[in-house]
Each structure stands twice: as structure tokens, then as C-alpha cells.
A protein has these predicted regions:
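Cys/His/Pro-rich metal-binding microdomains
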Residues: 198
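Short glycine-cluster motifs
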Residues: 1-23
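Catalytic alpha/beta core of large soluble enzyme barrels
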Residues: 11-14, 23-30, 35-191, 201-202
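Residues immediately within or flanking Cys/His clusters that coordinate Zn2+
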Residues: 194
Length: 202
């Protein structure tokens, strides 16, 4: 019996599951549990990838790990904008000013904005649904992080029960929330201003 059998899921015929089952019944298996997808922050960021199966948290941000501090840009977004001849200093600064989101940058085509939504712009129901789709092929469990800008007792209860009804073994690993007060964007603003003469302004 495979994991997907216990979930009542019929897999595609891409792989020969019958032959694998026959080999296991004949020869046994070394480990009873094989899969447990987990966050891999340091290695993921160093190699330019996002953590595990998580949605991206920002299209441009700095990341501190045990290995040091790194400036991270969404390389896939950059590639798409370069193809459209749209990647430039102004766009980069606008993304920073919008806290890593591109949803308010209307010069970027809608299909690109839809493709690169950050985690705060994605319904958690979709994240839980995708976790359930993976769950049928994960024998142990998965480290599922969820995000809510302003979590409440009702929203958390609803989220937990939805995941439970979908059959998730781990309801939640970390709950991420936004800080009540956002840090001031000292480094960049949506528009650059000419520097004024300090002596002249007296």
C-alpha cells in the first residue's frame, strides 16, 4: 500500500507503480518513511532559489543567514522583464518602494503581475490545497508555513480546520505575520528628488 492509496488518490500512469509494489513485496524496503519536505533557508537562498515549495515572500529583499547577508532578487521576474525590455533602475526602485510587490506597478503587464504575486497576495486556501495535492505522495509530512497579515482567532481556526479536512498531517509549521509597523523605506522612494543646496535653503 502506497501513501496515495491511503489518500484515495489515483496517480497518473507516468510511473510504473505496480512493478515498484511487486519489488517491495518481494525484497522489502530499507526505510518506512522517505519523504519530509522541509524549509532549507540557507542553501536555497545561496543558490538563488526560494525555500522549499513556498511562495516567494518578496521580489527583492535582503536575507540574513548563518552564512552571511545576501541581496535576493527574483531572477525569474528579472528574466521576464528583460525579455520585455522593461527591467531598469526605475522598475527596480518601484519594487523596493512597494515592499517587494509588483501589483501596483501598472506599467508591468497584468499576466506578469499575476505570475509574480508575493505570499501576502495569495489566498492561504490555495497554499493549503497545494499542500494537500502533495500530501498524497509524502509518506512522512511537510513543513507547511502559512501567512496572514493580521491573524485572528476565527481566521486561524478556519484555516486549521480546512487543512485538517483536507487530510494534512501537519496543520502548520510556522505562522508568518506582517509587523504592525512597517520599516521606513529610507533607501529609496517611489520618486527621486533633486538634491537641494543646504546653504541655499537657510
Amino acid at each position: 500500500i502506497f501513501q496515495f492509496d491511503m489518500w484515495g488518490v489515483e496517480p497518473s500512469d507516468k510511473y510504473d507503480w505496480k512493478s515498484l509494489a511487486d519489488k517491495i513485496m518481494k525484497n522489502g524496503i530499507r526505510n518506512s518513511l522517505l519523504l519530509a519536505p522541509m524549509p532549507t533557508a540557507s542553501t536555497s537562498q545561496i543558490l538563488g532559489n526560494n525555500e522549499c515549495f513556498e511562495p516567494i515572500t518578496s521580489n527583492i529583499y535582503s536575507r540574513s543567514t548563518l552564512a552571511g547577508e545576501f541581496i535576493i532578487a527574483n531572477k525569474h521576474l528579472m528574466k521576464d522583464l528583460i525579455k520585455l525590455n522593461m527591467w531598469n533602475e526605475d522598475v527596480k526602485n518601484n519594487i523596493i518602494a512597494n515592499k517587494g510587490s509588483i501589483q501596483q506597478i501598472t506599467s508591468i503587464p497584468e499576466h506578469i503581475r499575476n505570475k509574480y504575486k508575493i505570499v501576502w497576495e495569495i489566498p492561504m486556501k490555495h497554499i493549503i490545497d497545494m499542500a494537500a495535492d502533495r500530501g498524497a505522495f509524502i509518506c512522512q509530512s511537510q513543513s507547511l508555513n502559512l501567512w496572514q497579515e493580521d491573524p485572528t482567532y476565527n481566521s486561524l481556526t478556519s484555516m486549521h480546520f480546512y487543512g485538517w479536512k483536507k487530510g494534512l498531517k501537519t496543520g502548520i509549521y510556522y505562522l508568518r505575520r506582517k509587523a504592525k509597523h512597517q520599516a521606513q523605506q529610507f533607501t529609496i522612494g517611489p520618486e527621486k528628488k533633486e538634491e537641494e543646496c543646504v546653504m541655499c535653503s537657510a
